[in-house]
Amino acid sequence: MEAPTLWSVAARDGTKLIADVWNVNENSTLLLLPAGAETRSVWHPVVDHFPPDTKSRWRFVAADHRGHGDSGRSESYLFKDFTDDLLTWIGQLSARPLVVAGGSIGGALAMVAAGEGAAIDGLAMLDVPIVPALERVMFERRRIQAAAKTGHASMTSIDPRYIRGGGLIEDVYKDIDRWKRAACRLTIPTLLVAGDHGVVRTAEVEQFRAYVPHSEIEHLQTGHLVARDDPKGVAAILDRFLNRYWRQ
């Protein structure tokens, strides 16, 4: 597959948003959103593992969140900022079908946007619970902060303001019912990939099924950062999902 093309768009507040795009001229699009404190590069090995036939028929777009990678830094990292950024990408891509796959907060953004009527035709969520357990979320935050303190290379392209917290977790829990309402409204094909050593455990899977009865559930032997831990497995699951519903 050819090297990706770099795209840049302006968010609603003017923040620069960056993505890598493969197959620029295709309309069928898989938008790939990283987890928090990950960059778009985490999706490159996943894209590489897709079969040639799928690679030739789909446009792949791997985006950096604000404050991550090459996207611009921001004064604010609240949930609304990130959902607005996703809506910006959806508007810019003008793609049908548009399938969004996201890890952790990336998947949650897509779930909320889809449940609130955004032009998303399919949803794949990587280790995203409907109601995240606070202790596990805080563990992930502490893990990120510890990695940053030790100078881990993966943290050098993340805005320190985001790493310190930026109010995102508090903002999410202030209106967690929004996640529940969005999940209940989902009617599009929906896939949950649970990392068996991540934050989505048996109880969260059953809760997801209760909120989204038509959802499909897959499991991988990964931690919370599913795309990073098993790019080949993620590519295989997403490939089956795409071809099940949007085989051209």
Spans of features found by a protein language model:
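N-terminal cap/lid segment of alpha/beta-hydrolase-fold proteins
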Residues: 1-16
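Conserved HGGG/HGGXW glycine-rich cap/lid loop of the alpha/beta-hydrolase fold
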Residues: 15-70
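Active-site loop/oxyanion-hole signature of alpha/beta-hydrolase fold enzymes
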Residues: 58-101, 236
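Catalytic nucleophile loop
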Residues: 102, 106-107
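Flexible "cap/lid" loop of the alpha/beta hydrolase fold
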Residues: 108-115, 119-150
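The alpha/beta-hydrolase serine catalytic core
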Residues: 133, 138-185
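Conserved serine/cysteine hydrolase catalytic core
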Residues: 168-212, 218-221, 225-227
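Catalytic active-site module of serine/aspartate enzymes centered on a nucleophile-bearing elbow/loop
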Residues: 215-248
